[in-house]
């Protein structure tokens, strides 16, 4: 399932996939795969992404 919330949060900060990837220590391809729903990130990576984007885990990753 695509993660449109992650993509929207990143775009709202005018941040590229590469900028987010650099900030959390992964490749741009990893961020792309997460946004496309092709990769299930570790909880550690989820937390890093949330901190960088100023969002909670619930806001970006959990269905509900």
In which residue ranges do the predicted regions lie?
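Residues in the helix-turn-helix
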Residues: 19, 30, 59
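Short basic helix-loop element that most often maps to the first helix and adjoining turn
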Residues: 4-23
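Short, charged recognition helix plus adjacent turn
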Residues: 12, 51, 61-64
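Recognition helix of helix-turn-helix/homeodomain-like DNA-binding domains
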Residues: 26-39
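Absolute protein N-terminus
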Residues: 1-3, 64
